[in-house]
Structures are given as structure tokens and as C-alpha cells.
From Swiss-Prot:
SMART domains (UniProt xref): ANK (SM00248), CAP_GLY (SM01052)
Protein name: CAP-Gly domain-containing linker protein 4
ANK repeats: 65-101, 149-180, 186-215
Positions carrying Phosphoserine: S556, S608
Gene that encodes it: Clip4
InterPro entries: Ankyrin_rpt, Ankyrin_rpt-contain_sf, CAP-Gly_dom_sf, CAP-Gly_domain
Amino acid sequence: MTIEDLPDIPLEGSSLIGRYPFLFTGSDTSVIFSISAAPMPSDCEFSFFDPNDASCQEILFDPKTSVSELFAILRQWVPQVQQNIDIIGNEILKRGCNVNDRDGLTDMTLLHYTCKSGAHGIGDIETAVKFAAQLIDLGADASLRSRWTNMNALHYASYFDVPELIRVILKTSKPKDVDATCSDFNFGTALHIAAHNLCAGAVKTLLELGANPAFRNDKGQIPAEVVPDPVDMPLEMADAAAIAKEIKQMLLDAVPLPCTSAKAVLPNSDHTTSRAMLTSLGLKLGDRVVIAGQKVGTLRFCGTTEFASGQWAGIELDEPEGKNNGSVGRVQYFKCAPKYGIFAPLSKISKLKDGRKTTTHTPSTRATPHARSQKVDVAHFTSRVNSGLTTSKKETASESTLTLPPSEEPKTVAENDAAQPGSMSSSSSSSSLDHKQSYPKKLTTSSGGKKTLSKSPSLPSRASAGLKSSATSAANNSHHEGALHLGERVLVVGQRVGTIKFFGTTNFAPGYWYGIELEKPHGKNDGSVGGVQYFSCSPRYGIFAPPSRVQRLSDSLDTLSEISSNKQNHSYPGFRRSFSTTSASSQKEINRRNAFAKTKTTLRRSWSSSTTAGGLEGTVKLHEGSQVLLTSSNEMATVRYVGPTDFASGIWLGLELRSAKGKNDGAVGDKRYFTCKPNYGVLVRPSRVTYRGISGSKLIDENC
């Protein structure tokens, strides 16, 4: 049924609805408005509707502008529209729209759009909260769902991390509504949605308002188990890794302790299930195991615990890196020396292999007790600092090496002492530093069956096994036939040029790091961090980077451009809240999110395979004249230049802003890239702008 099919209904006044004489009072019938494109002024210089523009205001307040056209305006994911949700929404109501009527393209109501408009960095939270309260007073039904996403208002508010809207919605809802499920998220609750998208504010508010932290989705996962694993996040997402740790701990703390009458013999309870779990993993008590590829010890306990639900493993570590003596909360699960005991989920442990030096770098397919992301063989990760563990691998002809000066002392490491370490600290500084790539080593086999490893003279007490070559990706490996040497010029993160001065382990973070002296003062130190001098250079000329971020400098500008465009932006669909629904791309966007939620294999694969707005980036490229959004200031700008620059490597965008908030007139130094008014120009990386919700780094022609 459409608006044109409605019969004439006599209007009745009321104290609240009297402000909107066209509302259908006394009728719960809602309609779905036909699909329309957003109206735009004929002389408009930009590609979106701006309610603050005079010509756009004429269209907005024109009674001839239809409800379908106003819904089309609401679909535009730009601050100018989302921050004026109340103005546009009231115009929709004034044109005779029922408060629960839906947009024909997205099947969303005004309340759904309002929950979206509270998103940080795009909308205005205060405006969204006031308008949501107004809609609920007018009779908006918070339980209505979009038939495309199956999400209700609470789900949208949780997805976009708007705690204030969550409180408004649940204030008038039934207690059970807080745990309403959504099929698009494996029939998880709003708490699952917030946890999966790292919405800390939403998680905290939902828990305060009675959300069930032990609710299991269709995959048997509680909210704590859908939090992305920090080990699968790239280095530039260290902040997200810290948030993930905080959210997971918050959810685990909220899970009620299991009430059983056999607490005194808790370590022996559920013995059959524990034995079955161990058997499926090929383990038994007393086996040597590795925890998340990081710590090595002996399996002493397996079963349920008082401190958390599910099956847990108790391990006695080889080194005093644990947290207890086998007891937690006055319950003794096993016995060991203080600081040698640690507990871990069964999904985080694996049997310590004897032939680890020949371990291949392929995803492990061992069974896990919960449906989780596919785990990766951790033999190639670097051990935690001060763990005393070293890694030994079989040397292959194709592996490149980093050659150190002959004056360095060799360090001998027995093969039997080699371990399978891996950095899985949840802190913000240790999120998957090695990017799950193999970094070959230079090994010299001795007659005694041992291998000697060269160590860095800059830090003789800390450099241990495993000097690694820089292998940024499979694509880049093809032209990394030679080794990276101390003193060689390299490109750091695809942006900064410098010379390698140091390679080895450090005190400030686990893993192996390059110390690089930059050619320009764009660094962060003088070669020292935390009072430890790793190499010497001028202040602000020194920088440290993991091997995955260092690339041999090529004389080809095309190669530099390719490196820059490939490395400067990594996105994770779970964190993207663009949710853009513009015109024909809406259904493709929904299909994209469905496919990610239902068929996700590994989070690592997601970093590089995410798409938005129905793959629009595959057909649209930024060019001179394109209108983009500068995300750092929420300012619209016009692209005036696309290409390389003299001051830094890679592709840059020259933007002309609409106000004098820039830094130049299109010239930097002695080189002019474009022309505009003084302080109206700025040059930025493509990743700093978006075009219709798509990152500019995805819309750059590699042949620029």
C-alpha cells in the first residue's frame, strides 16, 4: 500500500499531534513510500543536499517536495544532512506522514534514521536524542524492524554506538526488548552487535540497563566471544585492540558465575566434556602446549571454572610469566609455583610440536569448542620480550637474509629449545606486529646440530634469534629478491624515506623492529626510546617500524605510488559505520554486510577485502573537480590535484576548501600543484577524505 491508496480520514486534534494537523490520528496504519531520488538545486556545485544552503532550503520547505524525496535526502550519509535530522524529519511529518511510515528503498522508519544520525563524527547526538524522544511521544514503535536488515531502533543505536539513544529507546520499551535478537547478526542481541563493532559506550549502557551478557547467538557465542581478537588487527589499529580488550573484560566480568552444588569439587566437574574437548584437540593432561603462540608450558587442568563460563585450560608455564599458582578466587584448580600458573580458553592453546622449525605458515584447521574466526599457525610470530624463547626455522633457498657486519658475536641456540612464540598481548602496542607473514632468517648450521644466529651490536643483551627480512605482502615479495642491509635506504609505511640503522628486539614492544634515520625531521626520536639508545641520529629524525612496514626504496615513482595506495588504508567492516543507503547502492550495501556477518572466515582476511556501497569504488575514481569530505574537519572540499609530490612519496590530493581553514594556496615550497585563494588549499593523503562514504584511498587510479 502506498500513500496514494489511503482513503480520506477525518482529522481529530490532540494536545501533542495538534502541532502536525496532517497526521492520521487514531490510525495505526503505516505505509511504504515509493523510491525517489534526492532533489537538488539546478545550480548546485556539490553532490549532496545541504539544508544550510539557501537554494536547498527552498526545496526542503517547498510543499511540493514529496515525502519520498525527503526520505532520499535522509539517506545521504553526510554531516550536513545527519546533523539536521530534526528539520528534515519534521518536514516529513508535516506532509502527512505517519510516524511509523517507511522509506521504500531501505524500509526504515524515521526512528531508524534518527538512531543512525547519532553516529559520532557524522551526526549530532543532542539533536538525535531530542528528535527520537519527540517521535516516541508521537507514537513511534521502537520494536519495528527494517525488512532488509531485520534491525530495530535499539539495534541501530547499538551499531552506531549512541548510548544516549539506547537509554531513550529502552525507557519506554518492555524489559525483554533489551535482548531482542537480529538475524543479520547470527540472531545475536544488541549487546552482540555492540561488542562485535567495538562500541564500548553502547556495551556499558546495555549492561547497565539489563542486557544479558550470557545470551548465546545461533553459533553458541556469548557477547564476549564475538569481540574481535586484537591479534588479528593490523598495527595501525592499536587503539582498537585496546578497546577490544576493555570490552571483553567488561563483558566477562558481567557474566554471572555458574551456580552448582559441586563447587568444592569444581575442578573435577564436567569431566566427560573436558576429556572430549582435549581429545578433539589431540591433547591430554601433562602435554606441552603453547598459549596463543606466545607462552609455553605444561597442561595441568581442563574443565569448567568459577571465574568464567565455558571450558578452560590451566597451564604451568616454563617461565614466571603467569598470574597465579593454579588457584583463582580461593579455588585451587592445580598446583604450581607462584606466577607460573595461567588459565586460557581451550581455543587459545595448541600442542607444542617437536619439528617447529619446519612449520608452514598456513591457517590451522584444528577443531575449536566455539565457532570462532579461523586461527592461524603461530609458529612464525615473535616471542614476548624477556620470554627466553627463540625461534628456529628451516632455511630455504628462496629466503632472503639481512646481513650484519662480520664483527658481531654469534649466538648459539639449540634446536630443542626453539619454541612457537607469538605476540598476542591485548595492549595497544602489540597487535599482530608481524602481520602473519614469514620473515626468513640467516642461520648457520654447525656440526653439533645447532644453529648460530647473528645479533645486533646496538643491543647485544636483547637481540636474539630470528633476523627477519621485510616482507610487506605477498605482492611485494616478488620484487624483494635481495636482502635488506644496515645502511640501506628504505620506505617506511609507504610515506617516509630513510636509512636502516638498527634491527633487533627492543624494550618498548615485542617482536623485531627496524630503527630508521629519516631524511626529513618527520620522526619521533633520536634513536632512543625509554632511555635505551638503539642507534644515534638527530632529534625527530629517528623512527622505529616493524618489518611489515618497511620497503626497499625503488627509483620508480610508479612503485612508490603503488606501495602508498596499497598500505595507507586498512578497514574492517565491523568498524565501518557508514551504512550508506544512497539510491541504487543501498541493497548492495546490505548484501555486503550480510555476507560479512554470515560467512566471515578470518578477521585478517577482512582487513583487506571490505567493500562499501555496493563496490562503488570499483567504478568511480577521484579526479579534479570531485567533491569530497575531509574527515578530519568534516569540511567539504573540491579536488584540484591528484598525483605525486616533491615533499613526500606516494599519491596526494590537492583540495580547495570552502573556507579559509587550509594551509596554503596550492603551493608547497617552490612547487605549485594547483591554484586557489590563500589558506584555502591543503594537500592530504587520499585516506583522509571520503566520497559518498567511501575512503578516498580506494578511489585512486594507481596510474596517477
